[in-house]
Amino acid sequence: LYGVDLYGKKELPGLLHELAQIPGIYWIRILYCYPEEITDELINAIAAEPKVCNYLDIPIQHASDNVLKRMGRRTDQAELRAIIGKLREKIPDICLRTTLISGFPGETQEDFEELYRFVNEMEFDRLGVFPYSQEEDTPAATMEDQVPQEVKEFRRDELMELQQAIAFDKAEDMVGHILTVMIEGKVADEETYV
């Protein structure tokens, strides 16, 4: 949403182009971007600027249109597929991360299976799943069809097991590649860096 308060319109692509011109800045990373904010202009800016990391964290939350609608999300599965497809077409080596919610009120077994298939097909590089938490004073807290806690956790575990296999395959594909990395520090008492 960068720029809306200043210019009355979204200007993140322009900001990326300007930041990329600053000497001494080597990496620019967009940390969090809702699907509806990912425009062709943003994709083109990421693709065009070598200093902009080929990385996006896109919190899709779910892939079942039924659940997305109950959540009040502004995208559906077809739009999510189109966005991910465009990103991978324009930026083939992009790293995509997402977060999901298991057991949102009204999530059926069919909704969960649809989400599972979506994750399997999209093969995200990184993925986190959180069981829905019934927060007081939120619209979802009073929705009918609350999912039992053990079902939410089971579905989370199923998705994370799938993601582990996907991540393992992706890591195997990187064996032998030389990459530029940023070291944030050394793990105490180990020869490991993070």
Where would I find each of the regions flagged by the language model?
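Radical SAM enzyme [4Fe-4S]-AdoMet core and its adjacent flexible, acidic
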Residues: 4-24, 70-74, 134-165
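Conserved SAM/AdoMet-binding glycine-rich loop
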Residues: 1-112
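Short, hinge-like loop/turn segments at secondary-structure boundaries
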Residues: 46-48, 115, 144-147
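Short acidic/polar active-site loop segments enriched in Thr and Asp
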Residues: 26, 125, 130
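Contiguous mid-protein beta-loop-alpha structural module that forms a pocket-lining wall or clamp
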Residues: 107, 119-124
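Terminal RNA-binding accessory module
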Residues: 131, 142-194
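Hydrophobic, well-ordered secondary-structure elements that form the walls
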Residues: 58, 99, 119, 127, ...
